[in-house]
């Protein structure tokens, strides 16, 4: 059974991974709606039978070519995108995790048009959503606390 992303019958569960390496976070430019063309955190939809962490690892490999280790849960939030008539076009519940690179080189792959590594003080130049900015800054703080 295929789940409809547009005009879903119920909220869809997504996962994301904030990958930090060498004091920089990995950003992706979305290649498909919603937020097509905008910079964001890599991630996507959880598949049936997958744990959150398995989903994060799969999505990061698909979108960026990186094999990652999931370090710690960051936060959960929801994104609701209404259409022009006020109907819910997209509704996601997203769990984001702090991740570390195990292997690979970051590259744009599935559903991604570009990748970039950004220091915390450089985030503003990528015009991230307020939620993505908050999550990434929280990930940097967690990374520093881990030493």
Language-model region placement:
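The catalytic Nudix box helix
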Residues: 41-74, 97
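Acidic, metal-coordinating catalytic segment for phosphate/diphosphate chemistry
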Residues: 1-16, 87
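NUDIX/MutT-family hydrolases
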Residues: 96, 107-139
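A cytosolic small-molecule/anion-sensing beta-strand core signal
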Residues: 21, 29
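Active-site-adjacent beta-strand/loop module that shapes the phosphate/pyrophosphate-binding cleft
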Residues: 78-105
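A conserved beta-turn-beta hairpin within the catalytic core of GNAT-like acetyltransferases
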Residues: 34-37
């Amino acid at each position: 059974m295929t789940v409809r992303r547009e005009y879903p019958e119920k909220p869809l569960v997504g996962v994301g991974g904030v990958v930090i390496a060498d004091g920089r976070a990995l950003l992706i430019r979305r290649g498909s709606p919603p937020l097509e063309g905008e910079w964001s955190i890599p991630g996507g939809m959880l598949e049936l039978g997958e744990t959150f962490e398995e989903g994060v690892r799969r999505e990061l490999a698909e979108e960026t070519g990186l094999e990652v280790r999931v370090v710690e849960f960051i936060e959960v939030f929801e994104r609701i995108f209404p259409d022009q008539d006020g109907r819910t076009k997209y509704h996601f519940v997203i769990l984001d995790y702090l991740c570390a690179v195990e292997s690979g080189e970051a590259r744009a792959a599935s559903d991604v048009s570009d990748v970039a590594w950004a220091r915390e003080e450089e985030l503003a130049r990528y015009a991230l959503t307020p939620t993505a900015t908050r999550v990434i800054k929280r990930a940097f703080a967690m990374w520093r606390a881990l030493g």
